[in-house]
């Protein structure tokens, strides 16, 4: 068989001279195209990042509060210090939660403006809507954990009160304790308390301490009650579309990954086989 390598190399050089820009599409420098929505997306990204950071800090505070509540129930010393720390964390959670809620409302307005200006199917509208739903759900989850921590602390206090009542010889159910808590009739425990019964007196002191803790818990829960209502309305509006958004985001990630893989294969194929196209045209010559 005749060696035709020299001819193929000559044809390759001729082809490069005839189409100088055809083989360098991947390596040629490109100018970035500035779209009208770029500034909006940058502003939106900053808002999203800010809310994400605040949600993370809120979740950290909520879990700190849970640990403080456990310390309050198990520790026998420094109770006043633990109470101060717990109240301080609860106030920080309330303030941060209100700030996140306000930022979510602003983001919602920004999303609606983008949709009205660029259309519901534009990239900026879809991105803002999807991110808003995800951030609102994260905020809801953090506040749900906060509510669970406070309710658990409340139940634990009631259990401790019930145990101390048993020490005093008073057998009461959880419902009876709840009724007495709501009515504020705690003085009935001291009516038959004898001065020489130190155990009963200590039990009464423990009951009064847990009662005060319950009052503080009720106050903290009342403080964030309005925030919980606003959050419920905020998230309820997103429930119908949330699953669809998550599915579309996942599909987009899958398609993007597949497209990147195909592009890499194409680039490698072109670099390794510069003469393959020419060889196809030269097949009749082999015969």
UniProtKB/Swiss-Prot annotation:
Q: Which residues form a coiled coil?
A: 41-71
Q: Name one Pfam family in it.
A: Syntaxin
Q: Establish whether keyword Transit peptide is in the entry.
A: no
One GO term describing the cellular component: Golgi apparatus
Q: Where would I find the t-SNARE coiled-coil homology domain in this sequence?
A: 204-266
One example of the protein's molecular function in GO is: SNAP receptor activity
Grouped into one coarse class, the protein's main location is membrane
Keywords in alphabetical order? Coiled coil, Golgi apparatus, Membrane, Protein transport, Transport
Where is this protein found? Membrane; Golgi apparatus, trans-Golgi network membrane
- How does the entry describe its membrane topology? Peripheral membrane protein
Q: Which GO biological-process labels does this protein carry?
A: cellular response to type II interferon; cytotoxic T cell degranulation; intracellular protein transport; natural killer cell degranulation; natural killer cell mediated cytotoxicity; neutrophil degranulation; T cell mediated cytotoxicity
Judging by the UniProt lineage, the source's domain of life is Eukaryota
CDD domains recorded:
SNARE_syntaxin11, SynN
Its family? Belongs to the syntaxin family.
Function, as annotated: SNARE that acts to regulate protein transport between late endosomes and the trans-Golgi network.
Self-association state and partner proteins as the record states: Interacts with the SNARE proteins SNAP-23 and VAMP.
Name the UniProt record assigns to this protein: Syntaxin-11
Species, as recorded: Mus musculus
Q: Which gene encodes it?
A: Stx11
